[in-house]
Structure formats: C-alpha cells, structure tokens
Design a protein with these regions (language model features):
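Alpha-helical elements of the RecA-like P-loop NTPase motor core of helicases
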Residues: 29, 55-59, 129
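Conserved beta-strand -> loop -> alpha-helix junction used to position metal-binding or nucleic-acid-contacting
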Residues: 48-54, 60-96
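Acidic/histidine-rich catalytic cores and adjacent linkers
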Residues: 66, 99-204
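RNase H-like nuclease fold core
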Residues: 1-50, 64-67, 134-137, 157
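Short, charged, low-complexity patches
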Residues: 28-31, 90, 178
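A generic short alpha-helical patch detector that favors 3-5-residue windows
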Residues: 23-27, 49, 70-73, 85, ...
Length: 204
C-alpha cells in the first residue's frame, strides 16, 4: 500500500495535516485525485507545493492548482544523484553540488550548475541531465525570503512524519487491513500535531 499524506503550512506559519489517503500504488494519477478532492473540499490559493520527483506530479499539480509554485525536493535530488557516484568521488561531488542549491540566487545557482556540469558531465552524464531537466523546480525556493527557504526546499517534514507512521504501522503480523492502517495513521498524526511548532522566522 502507498500512503498519500498532505501536510500544510497556513498563512500564519502553523503546520496542519490536510488529509491522508491509502492507495494500492503511488502514481501521478492518484495524486491528481488527491488534489482534486482537496480543491473540492475548499482548498484554494495554494502558494507553493513541495514534492518529490515522481513522474507526472508537476502536471497533476498544474492541472488543479495552475497558479501554484512547485518545489522539487532538493534532498531527494541529492540522494538520487549520489546513488550513481563512486565512493572515491562522493566527497568532492557533494561539495560541488552544494554550490548549486546554496547559491545566493537562482542565477548564481545556474552558473554553479554549469561549472558542475563542466567538471562532472563526462563521467556522470545522467546526473547532470537530471539537474538541468529539473533545475527550475529544484530552485523555486530562491523566489522566497532566505528565512523561509528551509521550510520550502525539502520534504523533510513529510519524510519524518512518514517514518513515524511506518514505524507505528509495522507489525509482525504482516499485511494489515486498510481500516487498521487508517486508524493508526490518524492517531499518529493527531499525536504529532500536538507537538508541531510555528515555522521559525515566518513573519520576518
């Protein structure tokens, strides 16, 4: 089963769970259904959505929330890149990657990507291609104030919540019913939400 989880930050900087869905597989079409349901429930004026790089997810977002910015998770991009890098290159490779997403702005990020590509492109062409293909949506966060970028450029909030849910739903009994998984997920979210704090520097 695949868990579809939507966590949000409202205009006051408060974190909220908008909902979760349990489906057989993860796909862009299923995400499209989720976004449509949220819109039907009244969700509107969505400023930005942070997501992973699932094929078709950007198109699903645009179909339902055409004015919304899309931010692909930089951490996912880094992890996927490093899977293809030899151990002897990793330390230097990581330092060069950091110059892209830690640049002062999008223009400098592109300049650093060009240098990155010049240095590593021949050895790791598929990684370089991925960075160029996804560059615009990997660097959306540069449009926002520096103080807020940490809450935008990664899906860490979702990832940490998913780890807790996975731990709580993992049992020795094997596959559990959707009803059981739903109850545990709901209770886990309820418990976690009592500890969520307002995003730091939200009103700066």
């Amino acid at each position: 089963k695949s868990l579809y989880l939507i966590l949000a930050i409202d205009w006051d900087g408060n974190k909220k769970a908008l909902g979760f869905w349990i489906k057989n597989t993860e796909s862009a079409s299923n995400w499209l259904d989720v976004f449509n349901e949220l819109k039907t429930r009244g969700l509107e004026d969505v400023l930005i959505i942070s997501c992973d790089n699932l094929s078709g997810i950007s198109q699903a977002i645009e179909a339902v929330f055409p004015q919304t910015d899309v931010q692909k998770c930089v951490v996912h991009q880094i992890r996927n890149s490093l899977l293809k890098v030899s151990n002897k290159d990793k330390k230097e490779f990581v330092l060069d990657m950091k110059k892209i997403y830690q640049a002062a702005n999008q223009e400098f990020a592109m300049q650093n990507l060009d240098k990155f590509a010049e240095k590593w492109g021949q050895k790791y062409p598929s990684i370089i291609k991925s960075w160029y293909t996804n560059f615009v949506e990997l660097t959306t966060f540069f449009k926002y104030p520096y103080e807020l970028r940490q809450a935008i450029y990664t899906t860490n909030l979702i990832e940490s919540m998913n780890r807790i849910i996975r731990k709580n739903t993992k049992t020795k009994g094997g596959i559990q019913s959707v009803n059981y998984l739903s109850k545990i997920t709901y209770l886990t979210l309820q418990n976690a939400s009592t500890k969520w704090q307002k995003v730091r520097n939200w009103f700066m």
